[in-house]
């Protein structure tokens, strides 16, 4: 009995083609398909069943030749199976059976793959094409889930790890889940194994060919999923126990790091970057950390530090650091109420001590300011929260006009002594709470500093129209008084200035104690304060030394009653000096040094006004631009000093032999060379500075050339370069002025959020009752700890003495103590074991303990962030990803329909055969009846 032939397509059309060539490839495949079918869609020639291929080899070769001919005629290249020019390896040539198998796996021919896996027992499922890809990799690359599931059921399947990486890179979630269900991932160790580690195990789990996988050797599945921002895949891998190990410190000298650095330093650096790319991925940050805000902030700072260390990868690390900062800003942007904003800014408040006076501690915001996450600090949600804290206990003042606020500031400045008295007497009263508010503290300190500047101005007011005493004159109040006693003594105005300076020194000491020396020196404004106060202190000390020496001389005169008029007697040298006019003083006189230092300190004091300028929207950006300009000037000074010193020494060497032989003293000494070249920058030096009175034209011409080159280099080149740098910095500030200003204002505000510094200078010198109470409480706590420590020490000594006595009398009689000791030892071991177990189960506490409020809020925010990221990704890939998926579905459906059609053809042929047999039997039955 004959059987209807079954039609099998060798290689069907695929819509998963190279970009831009999909239509042509489909047309060629459809053309070949119609060659095997008749006009009515039925097979022209009978084909043998599966597993019987030798008789069909000639037809296969003919079809392959025709396919290649058609493709060449269409003007495109097709990556054919078998040897190629670049990959000509005859030892791995494929049989017709293997080629058919790989074709079916690549183009989604599910029926062919299923039947070949079931019926072809000699089939090598790990056979590879000319590119070294096996059937599993081809099926995964073309998103054929059903074929992938069929192949994963086979034992000894190779390249499973590479197939997983490929599925992750393409974002095929269902295929990733199918591969993760493979027995190779049952223990989870494979998820933490990179291709390089797999090579050490000498297996083909990740093997691609002799050159390695298509992915980097140090990339694990979780790292690749994080790189590709595949949130669902990252979540799946994290549930399987996969984690990204943080790289060791850059300067780590452990054995592992030393070997990697010695073996291949470039590969070691790239592996670090790949790991940090995974750690800085928003997908990994949002799904792996219990506190993603804290993790992202610390990681951004770590990456910024690495950018300054590894200069060759600076751009990569900076990009990753900015990615972490953008992640934090994205979370803050998704907040919908004040509770969520406070959770991000404060962190886990339940595990931390509350802020001062019930004020939020803003621990995360402190970290953001420290790491200069400017967009986070300048975000409207953050600024609104800061503004509410800034006007604490003065909410009505927030909506007032600028005129009303100015009147409040003026009233505080005038009534500052009375407000300080109220706070001393009743620090916990309503007025005391208002004075502890950040805004009132800022106003009080600003008013105090303004008064200090006013004192500096008033101290010099008596000399505005010129001094009444010339430098060569002396003046005294009586005949027995030395002139220096009148000039070196401190006036009442200077005593007020000294009290302000002492108060500021005390405030800085408290700040150093609170912040620590490292944090204190990190702020540049603190360095300015330190320099200003140090110069003031040095000036006053020098002034006091001058007054002390003058007082000693005056005491000698006061002890001698015979000296009635100092102008009519001859004084000793040790006394006479202190009665001389100013022009006869020594250059190193303490009073002269004091006056010079005082002038510098006054300049620095007025420059300190720039600290409070960020509080104003108009002056804040200007102050920021000024600060950036100062930084540019310091950078410029390196090149400037190098060029300046070169010409200064050169011109000095040229003219140092002509002292007295020039029209002026320029360049004859190092000092004159410095003055001449410095003022030449501003066009204030004369050309005749290089002229010699004698006929030494060679030296003079060289001087002209060097002086001209100096002016061209300094004035035309370097100064214009400095102007360009300043202009560029100003433009950067101007382009992002709002963010820069809000960040600077937040730093200013934050300095007044901390506890303390309520009373401004100089009222802070008087200790308040609250400060005395806190001091007594701290002293009491310290004494209790000291006494408790002594008691514990006495108990330990007593136990030690008891044990020593037991050893003397023998241990046999103390079985109870031994049993107690053994029980204590067992209890200690149990405690150690339980503590170890608790540390290992730290990440599982969320399952056993109820989640805290902070965890609930972060969970909500992370959900919103992930959903928003998925929506953005889908909108970006709507034209590309969905189209590819549709193509693959159509391709698989096509083969299924062809298989169903072939099966229906067989059934129809069987029915026709049976019908023919019945029709042929009917005449015979009629004849037999007759």
Swiss-Prot record:
| GO BP | cellular response to hydrogen peroxide; cellular response to hypoxia; negative regulation of dendrite morphogenesis; neuron differentiation; positive regulation of calcium ion transport; positive regulation of cytosolic calcium ion concentration; positive regulation of neuron differentiation
| Residues that bear Phosphoserine | 814
Where does the UniProt entry place glycosylation sites?
Answer: 560
Family the UniProt entry places it in: Belongs to the transient receptor (TC 1.A.4) family. STrpC subfamily. TRPC6 sub-subfamily.
What does its PTM field state? Phosphorylated by FYN, leading to an increase of TRPC6 channel activity. N-glycosylated.
| Gene Ontology cellular component annotations, sorted alphabetically | cytoplasm; plasma membrane; slit diaphragm
InterPro entries xref list: Ankyrin_rpt, Ankyrin_rpt-contain_sf, Ion_trans_dom, TRP_dom, TRPC6_channel, TRPC_channel
Q: Which residues lie on this side of the membrane: Cytoplasmic?
A: 1-437, 508-520, 613-635, 727-930
Question: Where is the protein found, in the record's own terms?
Answer: Cell membrane
What membrane topology term does the record carry? Answer: Multi-pass membrane protein
Which body tissues produce this protein? Lung and brain.
| Protein name as catalogued | Short transient receptor potential channel 6
- Chain positions of ANK repeats: 96-125, 131-160, 162-188, 217-246
The chain's Extracellular topological domains, given as residue ranges, are: 459-486, 542-591, 657-705
Oligomeric state and partners?
Answer: Homodimer; forms channel complex. Interacts with MX1 and RNF24.
The domain of life is Eukaryota
- What molecular functions are annotated in GO for this chain? actin binding; actinin binding; ATPase binding; calcium channel activity; clathrin binding; inositol 1,4,5 trisphosphate binding; monoatomic ion channel activity; protein homodimerization activity
Q: Which organism is it from?
A: Mus musculus (Mouse)
Major location category of this protein:
membrane
Q: Per UniProt, what is the name of the gene that codes for the protein in this document?
A: Trpc6
Q: Which UniProt keywords apply?
A: ANK repeat, Calcium, Calcium channel, Calcium transport, Cell membrane, Glycoprotein, Ion channel, Ion transport, Membrane, Phosphoprotein, Repeat, Transmembrane, Transmembrane helix, Transport
What catalytic activity does the UniProt entry give for this protein?
Ca(2+)(in) = Ca(2+)(out)
What stretches pass through the bilayer?
438-458, 487-507, 521-541, 592-612, 636-656, 706-726
Q: Which Pfam families does the annotation name?
A: Ank_2, Ion_trans, TRP_2
């Amino acid at each position: 009995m004959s059987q209807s032939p079954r039609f099998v397509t060798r290689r069907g059309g695929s819509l998963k083609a190279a970009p831009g060539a999909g239509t042509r490839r489909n047309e060629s495949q459809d053309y070949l398909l119609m060659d095997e079918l008749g006009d009515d869609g039925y097979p022209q020639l009978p084909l043998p069943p599966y597993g019987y291929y030798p008789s069909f080899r000639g037809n296969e070769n003919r079809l392959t030749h025709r396919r290649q001919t058609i493709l060449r005629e269409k003007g495109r290249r097709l990556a054919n199976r078998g040897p190629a020019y670049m990959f000509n390896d005859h030892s791995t040539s494929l049989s017709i059976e293997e080629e058919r198998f790989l074709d079916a796996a690549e183009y989604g021919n599910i029926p062919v793959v299923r039947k070949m896996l079931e019926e072809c027992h000699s089939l090598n499922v790990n056979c590879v094409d000319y590119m070294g890809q096996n059937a599993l990799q081809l099926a995964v690359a073309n998103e054929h889930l059903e074929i992938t599931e069929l192949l994963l059921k086979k034992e000894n399947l190779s390249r499973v790890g590479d197939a997983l990486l490929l599925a992750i890179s393409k974002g095929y979630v269902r295929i990733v889940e199918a591969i993760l269900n493979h027995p190779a991932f049952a223990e989870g160790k494979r998820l933490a194994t990179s291709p390089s580690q797999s090579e050490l195990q000498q297996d083909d789990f990740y093997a691609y060919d002799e050159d390695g996988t298509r992915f980097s050797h140090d990339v694990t599945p979780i790292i690749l999923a994080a790189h590709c921002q595949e949130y669902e895949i990252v979540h799946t891998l994290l549930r399987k126990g996969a984690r990204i190990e943080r790289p060791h410190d850059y300067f780590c000298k452990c054995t592992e790091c030393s070997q990697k650095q010695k073996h291949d330093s470039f590969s070691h650096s790239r592996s670090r970057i790949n790991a940090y790319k995974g750690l800085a991925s928003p997908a990994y940050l949002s799904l792996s950390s219990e506190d993603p805000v804290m993790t992202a902030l610390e990681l951004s700072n770590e990456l910024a530090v690495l950018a300054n260390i590894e200069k060759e990868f600076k751009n990569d690390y900076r990009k990753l650091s900015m990615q972490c900062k953008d992640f934090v800003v994205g979370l803050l942007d998704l907040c919908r109420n004040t509770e969520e904003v406070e959770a991000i800014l404060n962190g886990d408040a339940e595990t931390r001590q509350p802020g001062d006076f019930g004020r939020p501690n803003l621990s995360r915001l402190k970290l953001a300011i420290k790491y200069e996450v400017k967009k986070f600090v300048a975000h409207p949600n953050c600024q609104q929260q800061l503004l509410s804290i800034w006007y604490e206990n003065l909410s009505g003042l927030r909506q007032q006009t600028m005129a009303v606020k100015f009147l409040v500031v003026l009233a505080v400045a005038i009534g500052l002594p009375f407000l300080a008295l109220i706070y001393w007497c009743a620090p916990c009263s309503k007025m005391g709470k208002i004075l502890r508010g950040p805004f009132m503290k800022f106003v009080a300190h600003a008013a105090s500093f303004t008064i200090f500047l006013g004192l500096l101005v008033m101290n010099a007011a008596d000399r505005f129209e010129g001094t009444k005493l010339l430098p060569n004159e002396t003046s005294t109040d009586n005949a027995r008084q030395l002139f220096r006693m009148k000039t070196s003594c401190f006036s009442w105005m200077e005593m007020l200035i000294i009290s302000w300076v002492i108060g500021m020194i005390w405030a800085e000491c408290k700040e150093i104690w609170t912040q620590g020396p490292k944090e204190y020196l990190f702020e540049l404004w603190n360095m300015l304060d330190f320099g200003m106060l140090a110069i003031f202190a040095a000036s006053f000390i020098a002034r006091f030394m001058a007054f002390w020496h003058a007082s000693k001389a005056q005491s000698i005169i006061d002890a001698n009653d015979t000296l009635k008029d100092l102008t009519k007697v001859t004084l000793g040298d040790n006394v006479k000096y202190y009665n001389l006019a100013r022009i006869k003083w020594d250059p190193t006189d303490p009073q002269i040094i004091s006056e010079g230092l005082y002038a510098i300190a006054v300049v620095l004091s007025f420059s300190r006004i720039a600290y409070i300028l960020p509080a104003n929207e108009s002056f804040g950006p200007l102050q920021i631009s000024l600060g950036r300009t100062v930084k540019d000037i310091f950078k410029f000074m390196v090149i400037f000093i190098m060029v300046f010193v070169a010409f200064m020494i050169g011109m000095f060497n040229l003219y140092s032999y002509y002292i007295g032989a020039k029209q002026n003293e320029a360049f004859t000494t190092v000092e004159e060379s410095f003055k001449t070249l410095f003022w030449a920058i501003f066009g204030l030096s004369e050309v005749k500075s290089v002229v010699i009175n004698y006929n030494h034209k060679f030296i003079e011409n060289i001087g002209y050339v060097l002086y001209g080159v100096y002016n061209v280099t300094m004035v035309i080149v370097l100064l214009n370069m400095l102007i360009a740098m300043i202009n560029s910095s100003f433009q950067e500030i101007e382009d992002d002025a709002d963010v820069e200003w809000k960040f600077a204002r937040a730093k200013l505000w934050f300095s007044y959020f901390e506890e303390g510094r309520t009373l401004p200078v100089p009222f802070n010198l008087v200790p308040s009752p609250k400060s005395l109470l806190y001091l007594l409480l701290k002293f009491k706590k310290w004494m209790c700890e000291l006494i408790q420590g002594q008691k514990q020490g006495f108990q330990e000594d007593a136990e030690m003495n008891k044990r020593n006595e037991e050893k003397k009398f023998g241990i046999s009689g103390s079985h109870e103590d031994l049993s107690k000791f053994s029980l204590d030892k067992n209890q200690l071991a149990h405690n150690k074991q339980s503590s170890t177990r608790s540390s290992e189960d730290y990440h599982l506490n969320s399952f056993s303990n109820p989640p805290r409020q902070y965890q609930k809020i972060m969970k909500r925010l992370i959900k919103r962030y992930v959903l928003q990221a998925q929506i953005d990704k889908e909108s970006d890939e709507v034209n590309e990803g969905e189209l590819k998926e549709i193509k693959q579905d159509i391709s698989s459906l096509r083969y299924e329909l062809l298989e169903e059609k072939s099966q229906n053809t067989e059934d129809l042929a069987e029915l026709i055969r049976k019908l023919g047999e019945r029709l042929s039997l009917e005449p015979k039955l009629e004849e037999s009846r007759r």
